[in-house]
């Protein structure tokens, strides 16, 4: 396959600095990597955090962000087996790990101290050609709608892992905060596909209609509710069995520790800058609730999440714009005006 020497990408040279749409060199895959012609990339809140430098973990600089890239294999490193030119492949948040530490050996590769992160420590998918470790790259069936598949590679895998972490049973209630956003809209669908009943939290009538169209049985609008804890417990006959916090709201996390039912599980996914978990210790003990963090899935979780999608059980509510419009997407994200998931077309 013919691969150019230069490509279009969005790059920033300092955290919070200008987002530059410009020509950069096409990377050469290392012996353990594949080169992917990225057709589409989802835009995640993590990308916004990486650009702004919100987290206590330094990014590489300059940096090409993005970690939900779907495309075609156009280059293969000298030590790679099992991949062929023309295969469909996905770039995930976890670009690579050591595969030798205790975490990697127990299938907890995302917790590897040497993890290489797409769009954070490794140039990501906001470019036309990107590299990925051949072991961690996601396999996508030929014929997959790559624009639709892109958000599955982080948002889908992340919420699927969070729902597994909750350890609840079919027929149980799960509450999803930030349900109208990119992660939340997928969390509703995965929850329904796994047999759970969904109550959604977000703001505004438009998002209420949206989440119900995805399968939420109940909706609580935090902008009008006078007592969210009471409203949720009433709607779920005593409180949900689990709460999945995908919103970037410290207050929402604190509320979930109150409304979850006894023996329920609060799962932390969203990462509000500088936020802390505040929970009444007496209630947490007497109700025997669990508070668990859920990061991203391992290779098995990823394959399972993709399988739900390829079987038609998950529909990604996306809006496709050109890669050059990425700064505008960030503005919408900061204003809380994103419904569903934005996907960028790297050819525009």
From Swiss-Prot:
Q: Which cofactor does it need?
A: Zn(2+)
- The positions annotated for binding Zn(2+) 1 are 44, 67, 154
Q: Which GO terms describe its molecular function?
A: alcohol dehydrogenase (NAD+) activity; zinc ion binding
Superkingdom per UniProt: Eukaryota
Q: Does this entry carry the keyword RNA-binding? A: no
Under catalytic activity, the entry for this protein gives: a primary alcohol + NAD(+) = an aldehyde + NADH + H(+); a secondary alcohol + NAD(+) = a ketone + NADH + H(+)
Keyword annotations for this protein, in alphabetical order, are: Cytoplasm, Metal-binding, NAD, Oxidoreductase, Zinc
EC main group = oxidoreductase
GO CC annotation: what is one?
A: cytoplasm
CC cofactor note: Binds 2 Zn(2+) ions per subunit.
Which residues are involved in binding NAD(+)? Answer: 178-184, 202, 207, 269-271, 341
Protein name per its UniProtKB record: Alcohol dehydrogenase 1
Q: What is the lineage of its organism?
A: Eukaryota, Fungi, Dikarya, Ascomycota, Saccharomycotina
Question: Which gene produces this protein?
Answer: ADH1
